[in-house]
Amino acid sequence: MEERPAQTNAIVDDSAPPSVAQLAGRFREQAAAAKETPASKPTRRKPPCSLPLFPSKVELGQNGEEKSLPSANHPPKVKVKSSPLIEKLQANLVFDPAALLPGASPKSPGFKAMVSPFHSPPSTPSSPGVRSRPSEPEEVPVSFDQPPEGSHLPCYNKVRTRGSIKRRPPSRRFRRSQSDCGELGEFRAVEPSQENGAKEESGDEVFPAKSKAPGSPPLRRTSSRTEKLEEKSRAVGEAQEPEKIAGGSEEGAGQHPARASSSEAEDGCGSPKEERPAGEQAEEPTEVKERVASEEEEPRQSSQDTEELEEGAVEEEPPQPPPGGGAGGHSPEQGTSEEKQDEGASLKPGCSPNSGAHAQPDTSSEVPRTEDNTPVQDTKM
């Protein structure tokens, strides 16, 4: 700041003509002093170097201002080159990101010991660069590549929903498949049972096989269904037989329907031997017991039916004994008719032995209805 007033004094002295040579010498001395001061100051301080540059601008301002612009542009370049502290800082900045590149290394406790030696010798800018560069390829695969690959990949395999998706649908599919298999098993069980029912209607040889079938628990329902079909078909067949025979012989027309009605009425009364004439001798006794129990629950209905039959029989004459030719199909029923009547009377007082012998041929259509109702209730029991 003291140089500027000195310059103003020199300008004032320039007004005197003899002092021009003296002023020129002073300017040269000031320029030499200005050059010497920046050379001595950079070791101590860098910012003061800008101060002596201003008088150079003033000196050059008189002769030409063009030289002042390059002189003003040079000092920032000189700052970067001439400062050893800045070089050290720049060296540290260059090597610090190299040490920070691993990123995960300072977080993990094992790598802290490896990072500490790099921080200790930053005074030598060349040594940490040489050490950090070979260490980078060693640390980078360990920190970034291996640990995430080793730890996260199995975690993704555990956490992913694909595993759950693979687990859940099989259970539902297995349930559906099991249910389908169960239904198919039931249908398969129903088909042979129905075939057995068709064979039972045709012959008596299949009944022992059928008696074994209800013993297995899964085939009980199917056997009950087949029993319903068999009994219904038999009732219809028994109702149709007297009509066919009536067309053959006039004498049998009044006798066979009465026999059919007698056997059907006895079936409604609930005699235990009702199954024998129909060919059901090999059926299980448990089914007979269930039928007897279900028939005991409804003795009133059967008693009313038998009373109506008796009233109708009193009005008409009893039928004549059947001829041997017309009763060929019902020969077993004739032999056991008296026994059935006695047993039916002993089991239930509502059923009278005369109901079968004096039954009307017209009421034969009414009795099969009661017979059709009883087996449905038997299967429900």
Curated annotation (Swiss-Prot):
Q: Which residues form the signal peptide?
A: none
Annotated region (Disordered), positions in chain: 25-83, 99-381
Q: Where is the composition biased (Basic and acidic residues)?
A: 224-235
Q: Which domain of life is it from?
A: Eukaryota
Q: Mark out the compositionally biased spans (Acidic residues).
A: 305-318
Keywords for this protein: Phosphoprotein
Q: Name one GO biological process term.
A: skeletal muscle contraction
Which residue ranges have biased composition labelled Polar residues?
352-381
What is this protein's name?
Answer: CapZ-interacting protein
Molecular functions per Gene Ontology: actin filament binding; phosphatidylinositol phosphate binding; retromer complex binding
**The organism of origin for this protein:** Bos taurus (Bovine)
Q: Which residues carry this modification: Phosphothreonine?
A: T124, T222, T306
Q: Which InterPro entries does this one have?
A: FAM21/CAPZIP, RCSD
Mark the residues carrying the PTM Phosphoserine: 68, 82-83, 105, 108, 116, 120, 123, 126-127, 135, 143, 177, 179, 216, 224, 249, 271, 302-303
> Where are the disulfide bridges?
none
Q: Which GO terms describe its cellular component?
A: cytosol; early endosome; WASH complex
Listed Basic residues bias regions: 159-176
Relate the assembly described in the record.
Interacts with CAPZA2 and CAPZB.
The job of this chain, per UniProt, is described as: Stress-induced phosphorylation of CAPZIP may regulate the ability of F-actin-capping protein to remodel actin filament assembly.
Which Pfam families does the record associate with it? CAP-ZIP_m (PF15255), RCSD (PF05177)
Respond yes or no to whether keyword tRNA-binding is given for this record. no
PANTHER family from the UniProt entry: CAPZ-INTERACTING PROTEIN, CAPZ-INTERACTING PROTEIN AND RELATED PROTEINS
Q: Describe the processing and modification events after translation.
A: Dephosphorylation results in its dissociation from CAPZA2.
